[in-house]
Amino acid sequence: MALRDIFKFRELPESETSKPFLEHLEDLRWTIVKMAITLIVAMIICFAFRGTLVRVMQAPLHEIDQNLGVLRALGITDSIVVSFHLAFYAGIVISFPLLLFFIAEFILPALTVMEKKVLFPAIGVSFALFLTGVLVCYFWLLPKTILFFFHDTQSLGWAPAWTVQEYYSFVTRFTLGFGLAFELPVVVLVLVRFGLITYEFMARTRPYAIVLIFILATIITPTPDVLTLIAMSLPMVVLYESCIWIAWFMKRRQSRAT
């Protein structure tokens, strides 16, 4: 594949002229620069409120055991390192709409007039899905997961004494990962739009996808509670089904257009 074909997805099929490869690279560079600046500004804001962030992130611990709320800082620089770590992930959350906009702006040349009109509503829906995933994880799944590990540790005769580094690394990645999982419909929408997957493929692989979802839910939610496992898997199954309908709708619209 020639270098000029790498950015072929940014051009409309009916376009007769191709944009030079270096211009595509320049657009990509500016997209990365804008995303980096946005994330850095968001990190600075979050770092300024690190005390509030710490109290929010440790709230699930206090609900289980007041003593667990006192985490151990084993490193001299833990206060700064963990604060930057927390500010980075919190910065992703608050800057997510702008990051999505810059990504959409990069692929904008390949969008039709109708798709450009629904760009901002689509970004709003995407952020709403992401935020829903984060909140569901924080208020429901995260406390249950921490409680499970707390009791499992005690069942072995050990006293839970978690460190700052371990706790925040687990909580931030777990919460952010769940939020990104809720972006599945948006990812599918983009893949279908550029012809990388089809409605037929998704419908054909539905049984395998559902089994995979339950396996992932079992790994993510290490609890013997069947109801928790079902409650964890059900939203993902619904999201996958919605992706199939999205792919079907897009195929039908494309066939009508032709």
Residue positions per predicted region:
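Membrane topogenic/interface segments and analogous intrinsically disordered interaction regions
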Residues: M1-T258
